[in-house]
Amino acid sequence: MMKEYMRLESDSIGAMEVPKDAYYGVQALRAKENFPITGTKIHPVFIKNLAKIKRAAAITNKKAGRLKPEIANVIEAAANEVICGMFDKDFIVDGIQGGAGTSANMNMNEVIANRAIEMLAGKKGDYTIVHPNDHVNMAQSTNDVIPTAGKLTVIDLLKPLGKSLSLLTQALYDKAEEFDHIVKIGRTQLEDAVPMRLGQTFHSYATMISRDRNRLLKVATEMYTVNMGATAIGTAINTSPFYFDNIVPILRKITGYPLTQADDLFDATENLDGFVHVSSCLKICAVNLSKMCNDLRILASGPKAGFGEITLPAMQNGSSIMPGKVNPVIPEVVSQVAFHIIGHDTTITMAAEAGQMELNAFEPVIFYNLFDSITTLTHAVNTLTTNCILGITANEKRCNELLDASVGITTALCPYIGYQKAASLAKESLKTLVPVKTLVLRYNLLNKEELDSILDPYSMTEFIPHTQVKAI
């Protein structure tokens, strides 16, 4: 005997009891039981975008004369409520699921249908009033609504990432200006190289992150091309001519994005290289951030027995056994996020490669990982900017000490005394610990005025076209 707080629903597999007050139906519940995979539900931004597509479809089908106005109006109203987040708890399907996203699509169709039924004074589950497939999913397929919702979600999620990268870039440029007067020794392969300004180090980081941001802004525009109207494989089966021509313009108006219908709907339905491209751009950004964080950890190492050229903000105790130890936890967590995103990129790449024939069934795992990559990277950039970059200070005295102790300045002397003499000075300095400057003056290779001019910070660290070099 069925319990009073349950209702009976049926699909092509059979009958199943569904909680009476639930807006989801039998197909969503069956999917929940089939896919207890991650414990993480469909991304909430994806839910909102899928609801926007349902709203656009209802409007288009009503204008096409295929959906009765009274049915279309309640579907549109229910979709708006979903967009506002009123039924988030009724989206019960796991983020990773079999079926190319059919379970997510049907979860949405059932929630909208049952809410629309309520609006028409019916009881949930009475699909003779509003049907999940016949009405809510009219002229659609999982194979066009799911990838389109995925693209809209990528666009939405990339916006805050772009803003976060802008703030990080500006913070790095500010530090570049703040530290521009400080000369330090540059390093290649972790060995002393030639002098540079600490500001140049941070300026290079800012340039790199700005490039990452521009790359992501550009790849986001690729998401504007959608396959709505393709239905199952690209033939537009079960659509009306009006729907086919107008679904994208109506969705464009609802979203505010300059969406266009793909020229080749077969290609747009079966090939997911666009998502791989987005993921690769995220990976590049993550790699660059991690490289920068590696540098920051090295430059801040110490505080007494390391490089110690900069100091990172102290955020928390660094050890449960060593008193006073403070670790570079923010750069460390950003690097871990980078490893995480690189792993996601591999998953996305393999999932895109694994599609067969006219459809790729692995969009759920692509979206699960892609959305997480964007969101996690955004959070990492925010904490890096706020809790690290803005609070970095320079240790100018330490930079000068290491610069003076280094033989790297001998490179600046090569045009004036020759490579061989400069190399001999470097070797002698390393052996005797006598500074290179002292040796130059001791052997009368240059006078003090000439030496000071050559070793001027800007002479050493900037290309100055009018600099005159004597013949040697």
Feature roles, as predicted:
Residues 1-472:
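Conserved, well-structured ligand/cofactor-binding cores
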